[in-house]
UniProtKB/Swiss-Prot annotation:
UniProt gene name: rplK
Family indicated by similarity: Belongs to the universal ribosomal protein uL11 family.
Protein name as catalogued: Large ribosomal subunit protein uL11
Primary role: Forms part of the ribosomal stalk which helps the ribosome interact with GTP-bound translation factors.
Pfam family, one: Ribosomal_L11
InterPro entries: Ribosomal_uL11, Ribosomal_uL11_bac-typ, Ribosomal_uL11_C, Ribosomal_uL11_C_sf, Ribosomal_uL11_N, Ribosomal_uL11_N_sf
Coiled coil: none
GO CC annotation, single: cytosolic large ribosomal subunit
Protein biosynthesis found in the keyword field: no
GO MF, one annotated term: structural constituent of ribosome
UniProt PTM comment: One or more lysine residues are methylated.
Keyword terms, alphabetized: Methylation, Ribonucleoprotein, Ribosomal protein, RNA-binding, rRNA-binding
GO biological process terms on file: translation
Subunit structure: Part of the ribosomal stalk of the 50S ribosomal subunit. Interacts with L10 and the large rRNA to form the base of the stalk. L10 forms an elongated spine to which L12 dimers bind in a sequential fashion forming a multimeric L10(L12)X complex.
Organism: Sinorhizobium medicae (strain WSM419)
Amino acid sequence: MAKKVAGQLKLQVKAGSANPSPPIGPALGQRGINIMEFCKAFNAATQEMEKGMPIPVVITYFQDKSFTFVMKQPPVSYFLKREAKVQSGSKTPGKAKAGAISKAQIRTIAEAKMKDLNAADIEGAMAMVEGSARSMGLEVTG
């Protein structure tokens, strides 16, 4: 018989640095999930990734207090900041530019994020990434 799902929890955790301190510990603890077991499993799954990369994770927990988790790709903003080599987006996106990013870089990001985006084709995914870049104050170049 299949396990009964008790709920789902969405978190964003830095790769290789899951630990029982807030916000992970309290979020898992109040649902009765073994915190250290999750931290060890997550850190093992992300050991090959760039340390500190923010990873969205969806944890499905069951009534018997066991759990499974699915890792997604890092947010588009992370990829954009990395490609444009900026620390953060513009404080005033319509007026001041934080940096520039090329269409080729946008295509690379869209290809990496394609499975997580709600887009039918690569052009649609590129349009979403381009919109995110503009809202961060990045100039999209040829």
